[in-house]
Curated annotation (Swiss-Prot):
Membrane topology: Multi-pass membrane protein
Name of the protein described by the UniProt record: Uncharacterized protein MJ1644
Protein's cellular compartments: Cell membrane
Primary location: membrane
InterPro entries: DUF996
Keywords, sorted A to Z: Cell membrane, Membrane, Transmembrane, Transmembrane helix
Chain ranges passing through the membrane: 20-42, 62-84, 94-116, 136-158
Classification via Pfam families: DUF996
One GO CC annotation: plasma membrane
Species annotation: Methanocaldococcus jannaschii (strain ATCC 43067 / DSM 2661 / JAL-1 / JCM 10045 / NBRC 100440) (Methanococcus jannaschii)
Superkingdom per UniProt: Archaea
Amino acid sequence: MIKMELKEAKYLGGIGAVLNLVSYAVGGILAIAGYVLILLALNKISKIFNDDEVFKKYLYGVVLWIIAVLIVIFAVGISFVSLSFIPLDYGLTAMSSFLVGVILFYILSVIGGYFIKKSYEKVSYYTGVDSFRICGLLYFIGTLLLIVIVGIIVIIVAQILEIVAYFSLPDDLKSEN
């Protein structure tokens, strides 16, 4: 019988998930710290279960989300600068750059949500904590629904469930291997 310790991953992931949720009120730096802690937790889980995909898929998802946010910030900035310095008849260019940015944001967010869903499905499979599977599904559905704004609420629910999922992890698992 092999004993696999999950206690460290449980607390790293749980605290990281709390930081992500609190970042809406406090600021983006907490979100970065939260994602780093979750990535550390998933790296530990990947090593425990000898499956790099758990870590890699979540990492891909987060990187895509970061790129999506940077693109939309850049597009909004370009649009405002264009509208400020370019005659009004060129406003269409500013609007089109904004729309391209929003479309790219949406596409990258959905793909990122899909990767996070896949990562959490694996965590659920290995640990037996079904909250991870549901959390991943809600992240994906939330990113799909971002286009109608309701997705933000679904993502917040996913983040709350993510906290529950991490703190529901057992301190250790026993395997027959």
